[in-house]
């Protein structure tokens, strides 16, 4: 584990001492929410100001939530201004983050607290927690938004949770060190990757039974379906490859590898994967290679390697797919990729060791 890098100082965007030059966002009429119960005292004024700021974001802007693994915090980024507007303290070692379908709640895997915290995205207060096993790491939400699936790294289980009642509705034993989670577009197949077993486990969400165990390369960390469900991609961090899996035949039909001049194979470690909605292009975070690979998802050829921050972990598109955001663990920042030009257009300082990122839906 690498030592902590110093946490950058972010502009203060609410309460006394707010830096309006850095944090001003154009107002949009009719969206400010009443938070009168917070109106008393300095804390109340700060929360009210921040909530009004978030609610006033233009219709074409989105909010990104970045988990800072060593900072024990969530940094909020406005994707219109491309600035961090707030950092909120949460549980210990936050990694996986997932938004509810309406964007009203953020679920946070606080691994060292053995819990999944629930953050109200309007008040920015922790309002409760979801049941989980020890050291929850990553989550996936069913397409209808009703079920949360969680990998618990230390007990080799996948937990299933009702997103509305916040109650556990099942669990499935999987391989050793479960991490990556994905759900098929029709909601029928859940995928978990187990880092030590080196497998992708395909689970029928109706019967809660494993229907296939697919061997992949060493240390699989992430899984993602294409939007049409025709392919499942699994990244293997130590193996240095992407396994392209036929989710119907349950076979690896192709592997994608990476070559970057001047870097050893060992330095190229695929982690996060994001597909465009049309399924034509994929982006893969390459960890300590400090690159994101843009891949033609039809030919499986790398189109371009984009230099981002240090130790890139996970990725998230803005809903309009104008930008792709990357969480860069060692450089403590988020890189912003313009998806049309395939260029990095900005680096945004966040908290200590950013790991996960998710963007609020429209």
Label each PLM-derived region with a short phrase.
Residues 15-16, 30, 40-41:
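Glycine-biased, low-complexity coil/linker segments
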Residues 11, 36:
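Glycine-rich adenosyl-binding loop in Rossmann-like folds that engage adenosine-containing cofactors
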Residues 51-362:
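Predominantly soluble domains enriched in secretory-pathway, periplasmic, or organellar proteins
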Residues 3-4, 25:
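Polybasic, lysine-rich low-complexity intrinsically disordered segments
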């Amino acid at each position: 584990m690498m030592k902590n890098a110093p946490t950058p100082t972010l502009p203060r965007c609410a309460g006394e001492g707010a830096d309006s030059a850095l944090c001003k966002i154009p107002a949009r009429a009719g969206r400010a929410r009443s938070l009168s119960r917070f109106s008393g005292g300095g804390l109340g004024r700060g929360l009210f100001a921040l909530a009004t700021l978030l609610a006033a974001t233009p219709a074409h802007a989105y909010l990104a939530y970045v988990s800072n693994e060593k900072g024990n915090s969530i940094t909020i980024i406005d994707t219109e201004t491309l600035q961090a507007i707030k950092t909120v303290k949460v549980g210990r070692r936050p990694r996986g983050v997932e938004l509810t379908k309406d964007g009203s709640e953020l679920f946070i895997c606080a691994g060292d607290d053995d819990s999944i915290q629930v953050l109200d995205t309007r008040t920015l207060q922790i309002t409760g927690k979801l049941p989980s096993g020890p050291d929850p790491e990553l989550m996936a939400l069913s397409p209808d938004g009703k079920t949360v699936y969680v990998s618990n790294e230390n007990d080799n289980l996948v937990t299933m949770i009702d997103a509305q009642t916040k109650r556990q509705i099942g669990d499935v034993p999987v391989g050793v060190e479960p991490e990556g989670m994905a759900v098929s577009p029709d909601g029928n197949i859940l995928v978990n990757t187990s880092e030590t077993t080196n497998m992708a486990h395909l689970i029928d969400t109706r019967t809660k039974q494993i229907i296939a165990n697919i061997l992949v390369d060493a240390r699989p960390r992430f899984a993602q379906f294409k939007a049409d469900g025709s392919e499942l991609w699994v990244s293997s961090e130590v193996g240095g490859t992407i396994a392209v899996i036929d989710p119907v035949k349950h076979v690896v039909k192709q592997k994608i590898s990476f070559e970057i001049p001047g870097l050893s194979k060992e330095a190229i470690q695929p982690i996060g994967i994001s597909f465009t909605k049309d399924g034509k292009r994929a982006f893969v975070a390459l960890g300590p290679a400090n690159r994101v690979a843009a891949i033609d998802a039809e030919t499986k050829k790398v189109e371009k390697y984009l230099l981002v921050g240090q130790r890139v972990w996970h990725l998230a598109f803005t809903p309009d797919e104008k930008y792709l955001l990357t969480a860069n663990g060692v450089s403590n920042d988020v890189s912003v990729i313009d998806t049309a030009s395939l260029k990095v257009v900005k680096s945004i300082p966040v908290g200590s060791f950013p790991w996960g990122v998710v963007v609020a839906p429209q």
